[in-house]
Every structure is written in structure tokens, then in C-alpha cells.
Amino acid sequence: MQFPIFQEVARYREMTAAFGGYNHQLSCQEGQFFDMKNMTSEYFPAMSPRKNRGIVKSFVNPQGILDKENLMWIDDNELYINGVKQDLGDVTITSESPKTLAKMGAYVIIMPDRIWYNADNGECGYMEKTNTIPKGERITFSLCEANGSTLSWHEAEYYKDHDPVDGDYMMSTVNGKSSLKVYAASTKLWMTVATTYTQITAVGIGKGFEKGDGVKLTIDSGVSELSNIFVNEEGDKVSTNTTIMDRTDDCITVVGILNKTLTLTDKEMTVERKVPDMAFITECNNRLWGCSEDGHEIYCCKLGDVKNWNCFAGIATDSWAATVGSDGKFTGAITYLGYPMFFKEDSFIKVSVSATGGHQTKETKCRGVQKGSHRSLSILNETLYYKSSACVCGYNGSLPYSISDEMGDVKYYDAVAGSLGDRYYISMRDAKGVYSMFVYDSKKGIWCKEDNTKVLSFCKHYDDLYYIDADEKVMKSVGGTLLYDVPEKATEGKFNWLVESGAIGYSSPEHKYVARINLRITLELGTDVDFYLQYDSCGEWEHKFNMSGKGTRTFSVPIIPKRCDHFKYRLTGKGGCKIHSITKTTEEGSDI
């Protein structure tokens, strides 16, 4: 008798020993995870939960953080350095949040408050300053030397009857235009004085200003003798932009010419040092650079002087401004490879800084910074990373490129980012308003998803990355560093973590059976791990196994074979572990 011969069922054994992180796409490969929570690539090729964070400091109303040799932050309108509140005197920080904090030399700039703080000596003040001399107060205008000393002169008529001596000054008026001349005995000629100076005297007019400040002078119109000084008409007032050449509390010296000393008591006058309205700022080459929100103006301050933005004397240290003709608002700014860069959503403008003051701009059309994601700009290992409208981009000096294909079709907004070591940390929200913290390992090209932290601001300080949790109002450290001896300091306890595979089995048209799964895993004491399976995208997860203990071992998951087209697995746990490998044994069935 002959018996039929049965073919042995094909059995396949696949082992994954290198895990490629987060990949929220249908093309999620073996070793990648369609979803995850609180995982890290730090122990690649193994997959592991992230490190426990440090709870560094709690806040009342956090508004910003900055590294300036020590950690600085603003909490509830107060400035702190290393946890110590600073006395700002009459300077008041407003409640507007978040703040933009920038550093230039010893200075820390607080925007939009327009406050400067000297971290070396503790001095502080406002970048802007206005002094007003009201009607009824005496204002005197007189010709003077550059240092403010009195200058004596005579009209041209005087020298018809008197012989000039060396150094005599003469006021010459031709066709209503006055000019000052000085007599040179060696040549017996009257030489025109190239630059003349006027001293303006009034109680308190120069208080709070400094020599070299670029200011705007405004006075009530109607004084013809001042037409050579105040050249701009502004309704019922006239004004001029000039530089203070010398000052005391009660007088200032500016460039200008008068043909007689003049005293007024019926005019109001203001002296203003103004700072342009800027949406974003960055420091480069001992200058602070900024851009207007409307996307048409770029500015920089006077060399080494954050308070002066309107000094235009024609020298290399002048402040500077340029107009940008392209459409769209500015969305961010940063200094990269020695260039101030100003971003729009569809372009960036790079400024070539010149030592002579002849700065030049060049615009490149490409993926720019997404509106609301200006805090995503961060430099990591000489590469600039940021969130664009479509993706997270990397930029190394040529053109931006996407690094976030693994995030799939989910759209994210309002990104905030920081960097530490080889990792780029970014917190952003989806269209439903749910925030997620992602980490990009630039060395391995791997993304990991952590939790739902909403970050107000990141700040790298020495060997750790600090951030302000906007919901909990707490400063935390990524690496667990605890800087300050405060009651709330603590190391984060055990947290839940999760990894979920993509659909497995799409590469074969036949139905299949999951016969066995083996996990090679290192567990810390007190860690529990659960294993789940889902068949044919049914939406229900079947619990298969629980793992606990200590040390490294292989767990064999007991599975009753179930026929399916494809399947997914999920691992959840609480506590520390390292997943070294996952081995799947499957048996093929028919395609019916």
C-alpha cells in the first residue's frame, strides 16, 4: 500500500539584533518601530528606555532660560543667576512670555523688554532712553567746540574794521546759509570749518545718555534759527537724527551750526535713543543683529554697543540697516558659521559681515523656518537643524535637506529644540494640539520618541541639556543632573515605556502562523515587561507574556499558533532594561 507524501510546512526564523528607532510610515522595516514612548538609541544596537531626567527647579511663571557661564532664567518677572535673584533697581521685566534672551560679550539682552544686563558687574538698564524738556523750561543752543567748550566768533562785518589773528572764528552767511570759518595766519586765509558743533543746555537733558549715542532730537516747530539743525518736518514738530559728541547731565553736544546763541522757554523738546522693533535677534562679531516682524528690515547695532541702533557717522563701527524686498514675514534668526541668518518660511537671508561696515545680504529660496518654530533652530556638530513647514531640516552650508521622513504624514507645529552631544531634541505639537518630544541621533540617523512634554525653552549648560516644562513649570535636565540644593530637586522615578512594531508579513502573500517569539533582554531589578500581539490590524492587542527579574536572559513567548495575513507586536514596561534581540519563528500557510 502506498501512502501520500506530505510536504513539511515551511518554517522561517528571523532575528532582529539592531533596532532602527522610530518610523511612523507604512514602510516601517524590521527593527524599526511604528510607535514608541520614552525610548533611546543611546545603547544602539540595543533598544532601551531613556535615562531618568533630573527635576532641577520649580518655577512660578517661567519666561526664559540662558547659559551665560552660569544658568540664568526669568521667573515671574525676576532675573535669576544660579538660583539667586538679581536686583535690577528701577528696571522692570514685564509679564510678557516667553522672553528672548541673547548674550553679547558681558551683556545679556532681554527682549521684547529691551533690557540689557551686564553679567560681570550687575549693572542693567533699558536699551531705549527718552528725556523730555517741557514747555516753560529753559533750553539754550550755542556754538561750541567738539568737547563742549565755549566757542567765540564774530560776524564777517566785524573783520572789515579789525585784523584777524590766528585761530579767530568768523560766521559767514551767504544766501541764507551760514558757515563757520577759521583764520590761518600762516596762509592768511579763512578756511571753512568742516564740522561744527552745537551745545544744547537744559536741566536733565543729557541724563542717562552716553558719548557716542545715536539719538533723535525733536522740538516744536517755529524757530527758523534752528533750521540747520532740525531738518525733518513732523507735523507741528521738527526733528533730526544725530550723534551725541559729548555730554553732561544738563547738556549735550551735537553736530550743527547756529549763527547766534538762542534761548527758548516756550518749546517742548525730546531726546530719544530708540531701538527698532525686532521679532528675532542673534549675536555675531560683537554686534547684535535683528529683523523686523514684517519681513522687510534687517538691523545691527553699533559695534560692541547693544544700546545704539541709529549711529550713522560713515565709519566702520556704525550701526547698519538693510531692506529686504522679498515677500513674507521673518520666522527666525540664528548665527551659523559666522553669518547672521534670517529665515522666512520659504527662504533665508544670509548676511556677510564686513570689518569695514559694508555688510551685504544674499537671499536663498529654499525650505525656511516654519512660523512659530523659531526656537527649533539649533546647531549640533557643525550642522544647523530646524523645523520647516514640511519637515525637520538639516543645513550644512549648501541647501537644507529633510531628516524627518520617519515621522510619516503627521504635521507638527510650534517646535522648540535643543542639542546635546550627537542628539537633537525637539518638542512640537500636532494638529490636535498634542505635544511630543522627539530625539534625533545625528551619528546613527535614528529618531526616537519620548513623551508628551511641552517645552518652553532648551539650554545646554556644560555636560547636560536643561529645559523648562511649560505645563509643569519645572526645569528639568535630560541627563539627570541636579544643580541646586532646593527642596524640589529629585531624580525622576520609574516611568512607562512602549515600543510597537510595524505590520510584519507584507513581504509574503501567503497566510502565516506565528509559532514562537524569543526575546533577549536585560532587566533591572523591579522591572516588568509585557508582550502583546495584534493580528491582521484588528485593533485589539492580545497579552501573551510578562517578563520580570534581573540580569540578561532569553525569554520564550508561549504562543498558540493563529493563522493571519500579518501581525504586529508591542512591548510595554516600567523600569530599566535593554532589548538586545527579537527572534520570530513563523510558518507559512496557503494564500487562500
Describe the function of each predicted region.
Residues 2-70, 75-78, 83, 368-372, ...:
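Beta-sheet repeat architectures centered on beta-propellers
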Residues 6-15, 129, 136, 148, ...:
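Small/polar beta-strand repeat architecture
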Residues 70-71, 106-110, 160-183, 212-218, ...:
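Short hydrophobic/aromatic-rich beta-strand motifs
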Residues 75-76, 104-105, 111-113, 176, ...:
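Short loop/turn segments that connect beta-strands within the blades of beta-propeller domains
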Residues 99-141, 185:
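Hydrophobic or amphipathic alpha-helical targeting/insertion segments
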